[in-house]
Amino acid sequence: MSDNDVAAKRLTKPKLERPKLYKVLLVNDDFTPREFVVMVLKAVFRMSEEAGYRVMMTAHKMGISVVVVCAKDVAETKAKEATDLGKEAGFPLLFTAEPEE
């Protein structure tokens, strides 16, 4: 093995794959008050009042709405935190995390 072969091997960088992204979804229900949903979106996802209202209304009209797209661990943590806030308040509020396509 020549010195050139060794140098070439040292300069080769491993290919790093980007982590797969996940989307957090807000699932509409007929019981959780709109104001509470917006409050959760503001608290957990740091949304403005206007952005939270838009996401909530999209879920209300379409049945589901994408809240945010982020890394898997962050998406799962945020979805659980937001769902837990609903449960603590006695509402069936549901957020899920699933792979972004």
Swiss-Prot record:
<dbReference type="Pfam" id="PF02617">
    <property type="entry name" value="ClpS"/>
</dbReference>
<dbReference type="GO" id="GO:0030163">
    <property type="term" value="P:protein catabolic process"/>
</dbReference>
<comment type="subunit">
    <text>Binds to the N-terminal domain of the chaperone ClpA.</text>
</comment>
<dbReference type="InterPro" id="IPR003769">
    <property type="entry name" value="ClpS_core"/>
</dbReference>
<dbReference type="InterPro" id="IPR022935">
    <property type="entry name" value="ClpS"/>
</dbReference>
<protein>
    <recommendedName>
        <fullName>ATP-dependent Clp protease adapter protein ClpS 2</fullName>
    </recommendedName>
</protein>
<dbReference type="GO" id="GO:0006508">
    <property type="term" value="P:proteolysis"/>
</dbReference>
<comment type="similarity">
    <text>Belongs to the ClpS family.</text>
</comment>
<dbReference type="InterPro" id="IPR014719">
    <property type="entry name" value="Ribosomal_bL12_C/ClpS-like"/>
</dbReference>
<comment type="function">
    <text>Involved in the modulation of the specificity of the ClpAP-mediated ATP-dependent protein degradation.</text>
</comment>
